[in-house]
Structure formats: structure tokens, C-alpha cells
Amino acid sequence: MKRCCLVILSLFNFFIAAMFMAASAQTTSEQYRDIYENAEQDYSIGRIEDAQATLKSHLKNFPVNLRLSAYRMLVLCALGLDNDQEAEYYAQQLLDENPYYSTTASDPQRFIDMIESIKSGRTATITTTSSVAETLSEVPVPTTLITEEMIRNSCARNLQEVLATYVPGMSIVDCNDDINVAMRGIYSNGQEKILIMLNGHRLNSFATNIAAPDFSISLEKVKQIEVLRGPASSLYGGVALTAVVNVITKQGIDVDGITVRAGAGNYGQIKADMLFGKRYFDLDMLVWGSLYRAKGQKFYIPLEETGMQMTDGDITVGGIGEKPSYDLGMQMKYKNLQFLYNVQFSQVISPFTMSYTFSPYTFDKYTTYNGVPPSFTTRSNHANLSYGQMVGNVYLKGTVTYDNSDLTHYQVLNDPETSVMLDVLPIPTDIKGVMDGYPGISRYVNGQEHTIGGKVQGDWTYINNGTHQGQLSFGGEYSYFNLDDVEYNFGYDFNQRVIIPDSIISQGQGHESNMNGYVQLKHHWRSFILNAGLRFDYKNRYDDTKIREFSPRLALIYLQPKWNLKFSYSKAFIDAPYLYRKTNRLVAFMMNLINKDDESDILNPETLHSFQLTLAANQWLPGLNFEVNGFYNRAHDIIYQYVAQHYNTGTYHTYGVELSADYEHRRFTAHANATWQGVSKAELFNLNFGHSLSTPDLAANAVIAWKATKNLKLRTHADFKSRQHVFYLDIINYGVYRMWGQKVQELKEMYEENPIPEIKEALEEATRYEADAEAQVPVYKEIDSRVLFDLGATWQWRNLTFDIDVKNIFNKQYTQSGVSTGLIPQRGRWFLLQLGYKF
């Protein structure tokens, strides 16, 4: 009993002592909080020396959370006294205390520049995976960072070539339509599976989901390109299915003047760029303009290599429109306020006639619609206004956006006169009757889309003690999309137009809205980072059907000074494009399969689940960094076109390994990457494949640059692609298959009315012919492996630069393909000479 009493008394004394210590600690913490706030008050009223002296005298005794604030205030004090050396010293101390410290838009610009400069000197940072800057080692998914210097060294002409050069798993596909890329074997007719952003602003169309990595996105304005290799719907919703590409522009201070460049090359290439950038106190401004045009390279296509096998002739590859592609824009930042405005125009000439017909056509014979020749033409306007402010311990940012696009798809269906094309396509009988017997059949679709949106997001950074720290991010977004002023036409005899009833044209009009909310937690404990996020999207389609999708993400990262290991899972979705759903409905309406009031919509969202394990190492050998990533993807309901309609017909289960490395030594730099991909399940149109389609199983790139002299820099790029498997539909056999299908249906109806042996025998024979024709509809071909080499050089003298780049220097002849088309010849040896001057 006595011992028990002693124990109780000891515990009581310990409790009293603990309470006293806690109270004392709280009192001490409050005292230091008062000291810091007094210093902050002195700084705000201009007594900078007093604030500096107070902070320095108590710096070692501040608790962890106050010490970070004190370092920040000491940097501001030193900058206020124009003592950059001391400011940099305390900025270094701040980042030593918290390597993941991030500035906010409310911070002075000089402070932001100093922190970013020091962080970039330690390791590269990106903002795409979160709303604040992160190092590559702490991002939750494998990420490729492409710098301005890497872009110059690649000999690339546009964003497509930059991505295919540096991003493991990304390759060029040619769908006889717009400029396009595939990510880990997944792609569509247009580039609609990858979210492309400009300074965080979505560039993908809301009607088609397309954002082509073409010449309407200039490279001269780019500071860096951040590429998330994997699903990212947990942050960006229903467009970021396979990857996210965020194009980050330079700031005005990076340019600090005016830069102009002009160039010309073979095949009618003309290129011009202008940059203006300045910083005036708290105002940073960047203005850019770029244009590019090319007449294209001619290739002769023999009859047997066409889809219709009706005519041979020349096609044009690499043609960029009657009007040049251009990119005009302005980025302004004043204190906490940011504004972006961008105008893009692109006009790409299709080498062949539409889709499975892929035949030469006489481009110059066809009439123009509103000045637009046969092409895929897009003119877009993007505007973004945002304001950020610290509210207590939370950084809040609000953004309003406006996007407008004029979309035109003007396709040649068939050049010579034929009834086969009209029989195959789902065109109403009365319209077929007008066009029957004429050559020069075409289709023209145009629409004006408008989208307004608003977004609110917040970031709360917390520090519990020296080992626990993190950030909680949250936000919500609303967007409203409307497609109006739709024009739909068929053309015949090259320059004649069919009058389409308004009842058909009006089927393309409509509007949709989307709401979403997300939350993301990033918690850092010792050498571990837990990154988890969840987003919910609610979409109201034009037909009042609802899309409800959850997009989770989870990553665990283990950090060491020279290496890191991360495991991640993410799920993404992309809703079926508005245009696809409307096209399906329009075809059904024209063929009298539905009435005008039927708003049925049969296309579902596409989904992708991805598991990734990544090992990255820095400076294991002097100058060498590398990353090895293994992935397993499960994609379902992938949409493909079957003649004129679209279906959720694709399933892809793929796995692979990606390797990337960079090395730098004195005047020599090298970047290399390689990807191997296998397929465990690939289904399309109820057909099974043991490989990916029109993308290589093995791909590799190497970019080497060497500064030969003080004024001369040389560069080269090697690109290897293994054998590729191509699949498309034979349009002639498809027409035969449809003919026998109609015959079978007629005989079935006859046999039901009159079941005699003669009709039964004819039905059985027709059924066999139908099956034989169906078996010949799928076409399988192969593309041989190949290696391409590019060379380039830059000579600089004072403010003058001269560049020469030669693509495919050995003039390698090869083909490429994509979905819904045959083999398309690719560019041979193209060169471009450019002259630039900095004012």
C-alpha cells in the first residue's frame, strides 16, 4: 500500500512538472511570437535596421515554425537595404531549414526570384504536380523536365518533336489528320488523351478534347516544359488521361529586351519569332509572336498503296496551310495579379483523303469555305486572370478563364467519281442522290465553341516539429461550355455544295457544364513523403445525362541525398468528346435510326489505372543523373472510329520499363532515354492483338551537344524506333461486306414469308459471302525499324545568332500510321536556317 502511494505521488509530481513545463514552453513560445511580430511591425513601417537587429539577436532561440518566418523576414530586410549577399545567405539558411519551402504570389518579386534561383541551382523545380513548386525527387509521378537549352539542342521544330525526343513512352503517330503523339501506345485521331497547358491554363478544346502539339505553340517563348508521365485526373480532371504537358513561358526579366528571329528552309518553310520582355518594379511583362508556314514535300503514291485503289498520284506531307500557323500572346504579372492572353491558329493539310480511303487528291480543285481549304483548321483564344493572397496561414488563389475556338474539319472523301464511297458512308438517300455520279466529294464541319470557367484553390503549409511538415491543398472549379453557329456541308464536283436542312445542322448545337472539387495532402516525415489526392467531377452532358467520376492518387516516396524511390497509383478518366457523341447522334438521325427528340448518347468515359515504381539517382557519378521507371497500365473503353461513327471498343493492358539519363561535363551535354513496352491484353473491334498498334515496342533517343568554341555550339539527335504493327479497315471489302449484309437481310425476310429450299440455299450462300468479306475487312501491316539522325549548329557573335538545323540528314525513307488510316510517307531531309538578334 505504501509503495502504491509512493507511485501515485510520483506520478502526480511528474504530472505537475509536465504541466509546468508545458505552460512555461507556451509562455516562451508566446514571448518569441511577440518578438517576431514586433520585428515584422518594424519592417512594415520602414524601421528595417531595428527589425533586422531584433531578429538576429533571437534567431537561435526561435521555435522551428517562427525560425522559418524569421529567415524570410531577414531576407526581406537585406533586400530592402540592397544587401544582396546577406539576403542570399539567409535565403540559403531558409532552404536548409526547409528544402520544400515555396514562395507565394504575395511575396515581393525580388524575394521570389532569389528563392527560385537558389532552388534551381540546387535541383530543378516544377509546379505541374501541385500548386506550389516541387523538386523532381518529391513529385508523386515520374516527371520529365525539358529546359530551354534542351529544346535548342534537340533540333526540334515544334512541341510534338520535343516531346517525342525527351519523354520516355511518347512517340509520333500520323493519323492523316492533325499533328499527334501517343503516350504508352494510347492515342486517337487527334491529340485528345494528353492535357496540354500554357502556364497552367488548359489549351485542349472543350468540344473535341484536342490540343495539337503543333506550330501554334511556339518554342521561343518557353522557359521549360513539365511533363507528368501518367494519369493526372486527381488534379486536372477529365482530360489528363495518359499525361500532362505544362508549357511554362519565360518571364519578362528573362528576356529583358527584344529578341527577333527569322528563318527559311526547303519545302517552302518560313519561320519568324519575336519576344519582348521587361520588368518594371513589381510589373513583369512578356509579349510574344510566332509564325510558321511550309508548302510541304511531295510523294508519289502508286495505286496499290491506296485505300480505294482507284487512282495514283502525288500527296503533300508536312503542308502547313494556305495561311501560316501563328502564336500570339501576352503574360503580365503585377504583385498578386496575373493575366494571360493567347491567340493560336493552326491549319494542317491532310496528305490523303479521309480515314480508311487514304488516296491522293487534287487539293487545288476544291473550293474554300470561308477562306478555308481542305484541312484541319483551328483558331483559339485563351484568357486567364488570377489573384492570390495570404489569408492567415492559407494561401488562396482565384482564377477566371475564357476560351473560344473556331473549329473546322474540311475533309476530302474521294477524288474520282465512284458510288462505292457513297454506299459505304451513312449519308441520307436524298443527299446521296445529289452527289451520285460526281467526282470531288468532300465534307465540311465548322463550329464555334465558347467556355467560361472559375476556380478557387488554397494551400495550407504546416510544420508540427522538425521532422513533420507538409501541405494541404484544396480547390473547386466550374466551367460552362457552349457550341453554336454550327455549319455542316457535303460538297461534290469539287466546288458545289449540297443544301443541308437546318434540322440536321442544328443537331450539332448544345451546351455542357462541369463542376469538380479536389483535395491533396503532401506530408513529409524524415525521409518519407506521403502524397495522396482525390478529385470528384460532376458533368452535365448536353442530353442531361450525368457523369460522376472519382479520381484518386496515392504515392509514397523515400528520399535520400543522392537517390529516391517512389511508388504511385493513379486513376484517370476522360469523357467521350462532345463532337464524337454529337457525330454518333447526327449519323443516327440522318439515317432515321432516331427521331429529332431522341437525345440518346451511347459513348462512355475512357478510364486508365496506372501503377508505377520509380528509382531516380543524382550525381552517383560526377555529372550523371538517371531514372528507371516501371509501369503497368489498364485502359478501358478507349474510343476509336469505325468508318463514320465512334465506339468504346479499345482495351489495353500494358507494362513496360522507361530509362532516362543526362550527363554534363564541361562543354559537353548528353540526354538519352529508352522505352520498352509489352502488351498483356489489347482488344479493338472485338479483335485481339498481341502488341500495340502504330507505336514501337522499343524506342530510344539520344541528344548530344558540344560547345566547340566560345561562339560555336554543335548538336545532334539520334532517334530509334523498332518494328511497328499497323491495323486499319479495308474500305472496299467493307463495302462488299455491307452489300452482302443487306442481301442476307433481304433473303431472311423473304424466307420468313416463303420458306422454300431455293431461298434457304441462297441465304446460306449469301451468309458465307458476308462472312468471307467481313474476314477481309481488317488489314494488318508492319513498319520496319529505323534510325533517324538530325544535326544542328548555333554560332553566336555578340547579340547576333545564326542557327542551322537539318532533320533526317540521311534522307531516310519511312512511313508512319495511326488509327483509321494506312501507311503515310514521312518527311525526308528538311533544313531550316535562322538568324536572330537581341536588342
Where are the language model's segments positioned?
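Gram-negative outer-membrane beta-barrel transporters
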Residues: 524-529, 621-636, 647-731, 834-838
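Extracytoplasmic beta-strand/coil segments of soluble accessory domains associated
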Residues: 120-121, 160-201
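C-terminal beta-signal and adjacent terminal beta-strands/loops
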Residues: 723-727, 731, 735-736, 757-770, ...
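Membrane-embedded beta-barrel scaffold of Gram-negative outer-membrane proteins
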Residues: 397-401, 405-407, 566, 601-653, ...
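Face-selective signature of the C-terminal outer-membrane beta-barrel domain
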Residues: 332-346, 376-544, 627-628, 661-664, ...
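Short, acidic, small-residue-rich periplasmic hinge/interaction motif at the N-terminus
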Residues: 110-152
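Periplasmic-side early beta-strands and strand-to-turn transitions of outer-membrane beta-barrels
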Residues: 254-255, 263, 275, 279-370
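Short acidic/polar hinge/loop motifs at secondary-structure boundaries
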Residues: 201-229
